Amino acid sequence: GSEMCIRDRFGGVGVGWMNYFAFMIIAVFISGLMVGRTPEFLCKKVEAREMKIASIVALLHPFVILVGTALACYLFVYAPSFVEGEGGWVNNPGFHGLSEFLYEYTSSAANNGSGFEGLADNTWFWNYSCGIVLILSRFIPIIGQVAIAGLLAGKKYIPETSGTLKTDSVTFSAMTFAVIFIVAALSFFPVHALSTIAEHLSL
Protein backbone atom coordinates (compact mmCIF):
# COMPACT_ATOMS: atom_id res chain seq x y z
CA GLY A 1 0.00 0.00 0.00
CA SER A 2 2.74 2.48 0.92
CA GLU A 3 4.58 1.87 -2.36
CA MET A 4 1.41 2.58 -4.32
CA CYS A 5 1.13 5.93 -2.54
CA ILE A 6 4.63 6.98 -3.57
CA ARG A 7 4.91 5.34 -7.03
CA ASP A 8 8.64 5.86 -7.47
CA ARG A 9 10.12 2.41 -8.01
CA PHE A 10 11.14 1.13 -11.39
CA GLY A 11 8.60 -1.24 -12.88
CA GLY A 12 4.89 -1.13 -13.48
CA VAL A 13 5.57 -1.03 -17.22
CA GLY A 14 7.62 2.13 -16.87
CA VAL A 15 5.35 3.99 -14.49
CA GLY A 16 7.80 3.77 -11.59
CA TRP A 17 10.51 5.40 -13.68
CA MET A 18 8.07 7.95 -15.08
CA ASN A 19 7.13 9.26 -11.64
CA TYR A 20 10.68 9.03 -10.31
CA PHE A 21 11.69 11.26 -13.23
CA ALA A 22 9.26 13.95 -12.04
CA PHE A 23 10.74 13.82 -8.54
CA MET A 24 14.25 14.14 -9.99
CA ILE A 25 13.26 17.26 -11.94
CA ILE A 26 11.86 18.82 -8.75
CA ALA A 27 14.98 17.81 -6.78
CA VAL A 28 17.30 19.34 -9.38
CA PHE A 29 15.28 22.56 -9.48
CA ILE A 30 15.22 22.98 -5.69
CA SER A 31 18.92 22.11 -5.41
CA GLY A 32 19.81 24.70 -8.02
CA LEU A 33 17.84 27.39 -6.22
CA MET A 34 19.50 26.51 -2.90
CA VAL A 35 23.00 27.16 -4.26
CA GLY A 36 22.06 30.06 -6.54
CA ARG A 37 22.71 28.25 -9.83
CA THR A 38 20.53 27.60 -12.84
CA PRO A 39 19.25 24.03 -12.31
CA GLU A 40 20.63 21.47 -14.76
CA PHE A 41 19.59 17.89 -15.47
CA LEU A 42 21.56 15.69 -17.87
CA CYS A 43 23.39 18.80 -19.13
CA LYS A 44 20.15 20.65 -19.98
CA LYS A 45 18.70 23.66 -18.16
CA VAL A 46 15.64 22.99 -16.01
CA GLU A 47 13.45 26.09 -15.99
CA ALA A 48 10.03 27.15 -14.75
CA ARG A 49 8.02 25.31 -17.41
CA GLU A 50 9.58 21.95 -16.63
CA MET A 51 9.17 22.56 -12.92
CA LYS A 52 5.48 23.43 -13.26
CA ILE A 53 4.76 20.29 -15.26
CA ALA A 54 6.76 18.09 -12.86
CA SER A 55 4.89 19.62 -9.90
CA ILE A 56 1.52 18.87 -11.50
CA VAL A 57 2.59 15.27 -12.17
CA ALA A 58 3.90 14.79 -8.62
CA LEU A 59 0.88 16.34 -6.90
CA LEU A 60 -1.78 14.81 -9.14
CA HIS A 61 -1.42 11.33 -7.63
CA PRO A 62 -2.21 12.28 -4.01
CA PHE A 63 -4.81 14.80 -5.23
CA VAL A 64 -7.00 12.33 -7.14
CA ILE A 65 -6.70 9.69 -4.42
CA LEU A 66 -7.53 12.01 -1.54
CA VAL A 67 -10.36 13.79 -3.39
CA GLY A 68 -11.91 10.44 -4.30
CA THR A 69 -11.60 9.19 -0.73
CA ALA A 70 -13.09 12.42 0.63
CA LEU A 71 -16.03 12.18 -1.79
CA ALA A 72 -16.71 8.58 -0.77
CA CYS A 73 -16.58 9.55 2.92
CA TYR A 74 -18.94 12.47 2.32
CA LEU A 75 -21.49 10.28 0.57
CA PHE A 76 -21.17 7.57 3.22
CA VAL A 77 -21.95 10.06 6.00
CA TYR A 78 -24.32 12.55 4.36
CA ALA A 79 -26.06 10.43 1.70
CA PRO A 80 -26.77 7.12 3.47
CA SER A 81 -29.78 6.40 1.25
CA PHE A 82 -27.53 6.50 -1.84
CA VAL A 83 -25.00 4.21 -0.16
CA GLU A 84 -27.71 1.79 0.98
CA GLY A 85 -29.10 1.76 -2.55
CA GLU A 86 -25.73 0.44 -3.71
CA GLY A 87 -25.58 -2.30 -1.09
CA GLY A 88 -24.07 -0.43 1.83
CA TRP A 89 -20.45 -0.48 0.55
CA VAL A 90 -18.63 -1.53 3.74
CA ASN A 91 -19.14 -4.15 6.42
CA ASN A 92 -16.69 -2.47 8.79
CA PRO A 93 -17.34 1.27 9.10
CA GLY A 94 -14.81 3.26 11.06
CA PHE A 95 -11.04 3.10 10.73
CA HIS A 96 -11.08 0.01 8.53
CA GLY A 97 -13.82 1.39 6.30
CA LEU A 98 -11.75 4.50 5.63
CA SER A 99 -8.77 2.24 4.87
CA GLU A 100 -10.89 0.40 2.31
CA PHE A 101 -11.95 3.65 0.62
CA LEU A 102 -8.35 4.89 0.54
CA TYR A 103 -6.96 1.61 -0.77
CA GLU A 104 -9.57 1.41 -3.53
CA TYR A 105 -8.56 4.76 -5.02
CA THR A 106 -4.85 4.23 -4.38
CA SER A 107 -5.01 0.92 -6.22
CA SER A 108 -6.91 2.50 -9.12
CA ALA A 109 -4.38 5.31 -9.44
CA ALA A 110 -1.23 3.21 -9.10
CA ASN A 111 -1.38 0.45 -11.73
CA ASN A 112 -2.46 -2.16 -9.21
CA GLY A 113 -6.10 -3.11 -9.53
CA SER A 114 -6.48 -4.92 -6.21
CA GLY A 115 -8.87 -4.03 -3.41
CA PHE A 116 -10.04 -4.95 0.07
CA GLU A 117 -12.70 -7.64 -0.11
CA GLY A 118 -14.71 -5.94 2.63
CA LEU A 119 -15.64 -3.17 0.20
CA ALA A 120 -18.57 -3.85 -2.14
CA ASP A 121 -17.02 -1.95 -5.03
CA ASN A 122 -18.90 -3.39 -8.01
CA THR A 123 -21.39 -0.52 -8.01
CA TRP A 124 -22.15 2.49 -10.17
CA PHE A 125 -20.33 4.92 -7.89
CA TRP A 126 -17.16 2.88 -7.42
CA ASN A 127 -16.88 1.79 -11.05
CA TYR A 128 -17.23 5.31 -12.43
CA SER A 129 -15.25 7.17 -9.78
CA CYS A 130 -12.37 4.69 -9.92
CA GLY A 131 -12.47 4.83 -13.71
CA ILE A 132 -12.08 8.62 -13.61
CA VAL A 133 -9.20 8.33 -11.13
CA LEU A 134 -7.55 5.70 -13.32
CA ILE A 135 -7.77 7.82 -16.48
CA LEU A 136 -6.48 10.99 -14.79
CA SER A 137 -3.61 9.23 -13.04
CA ARG A 138 -2.49 7.44 -16.21
CA PHE A 139 -2.74 9.95 -19.02
CA ILE A 140 -1.91 13.28 -17.37
CA PRO A 141 1.48 12.04 -16.05
CA ILE A 142 2.31 10.49 -19.44
CA ILE A 143 1.47 13.74 -21.25
CA GLY A 144 3.43 15.74 -18.68
CA GLN A 145 6.56 13.59 -18.92
CA VAL A 146 6.52 13.65 -22.71
CA ALA A 147 6.17 17.45 -22.55
CA ILE A 148 9.18 17.70 -20.20
CA ALA A 149 11.22 15.44 -22.48
CA GLY A 150 10.29 17.58 -25.49
CA LEU A 151 11.23 20.79 -23.69
CA LEU A 152 14.59 19.38 -22.59
CA ALA A 153 15.31 17.94 -26.05
CA GLY A 154 14.93 21.40 -27.57
CA LYS A 155 17.51 23.00 -25.26
CA LYS A 156 21.21 23.46 -25.83
CA TYR A 157 23.72 21.06 -24.31
CA ILE A 158 25.55 22.60 -21.34
CA PRO A 159 28.94 21.09 -20.40
CA GLU A 160 29.31 19.99 -16.79
CA THR A 161 31.25 22.27 -14.45
CA SER A 162 32.47 21.95 -10.88
CA GLY A 163 29.19 23.49 -9.70
CA THR A 164 26.93 21.01 -11.52
CA LEU A 165 24.93 18.70 -9.28
CA LYS A 166 25.77 15.27 -10.68
CA THR A 167 22.94 12.77 -10.82
CA ASP A 168 25.20 9.94 -9.59
CA SER A 169 26.18 11.74 -6.38
CA VAL A 170 25.10 11.09 -2.79
CA THR A 171 23.89 14.70 -2.54
CA PHE A 172 21.51 14.24 -5.46
CA SER A 173 20.23 10.95 -4.02
CA ALA A 174 19.58 12.57 -0.64
CA MET A 175 17.82 15.53 -2.25
CA THR A 176 15.62 13.25 -4.35
CA PHE A 177 14.73 11.17 -1.28
CA ALA A 178 13.82 14.35 0.62
CA VAL A 179 11.54 15.51 -2.21
CA ILE A 180 9.82 12.11 -2.40
CA PHE A 181 9.35 12.02 1.37
CA ILE A 182 7.97 15.55 1.64
CA VAL A 183 5.83 15.67 -1.51
CA ALA A 184 4.59 12.08 -1.75
CA ALA A 185 4.84 10.36 1.62
CA LEU A 186 3.68 13.21 3.85
CA SER A 187 0.71 13.95 1.57
CA PHE A 188 -0.86 10.69 2.73
CA PHE A 189 0.16 10.80 6.39
CA PRO A 190 -2.99 12.56 7.71
CA VAL A 191 -5.40 10.10 6.08
CA HIS A 192 -3.27 7.13 7.14
CA ALA A 193 -3.26 8.50 10.69
CA LEU A 194 -7.07 8.38 10.60
CA SER A 195 -7.29 4.93 8.99
CA THR A 196 -4.49 2.36 8.95
CA ILE A 197 -2.45 3.77 11.85
CA ALA A 198 -5.53 4.44 13.99
CA GLU A 199 -6.82 0.92 13.32
CA HIS A 200 -3.47 -0.60 14.28
CA LEU A 201 -3.30 1.38 17.52
CA SER A 202 -6.87 0.46 18.44
CA LEU A 203 -6.31 -3.31 18.16
Per-region residue spans from a language model:
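Short, small-residue-biased leader/transition segments that mark boundaries at the very start
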Residues: G1-I6
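Hydrophobic mid-bilayer segments of alpha-helices in multi-pass membrane transport proteins
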Residues: N19-I26
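Final/C-terminal transmembrane alpha-helix of multipass membrane proteins
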Residues: P62-F63, T171-A193
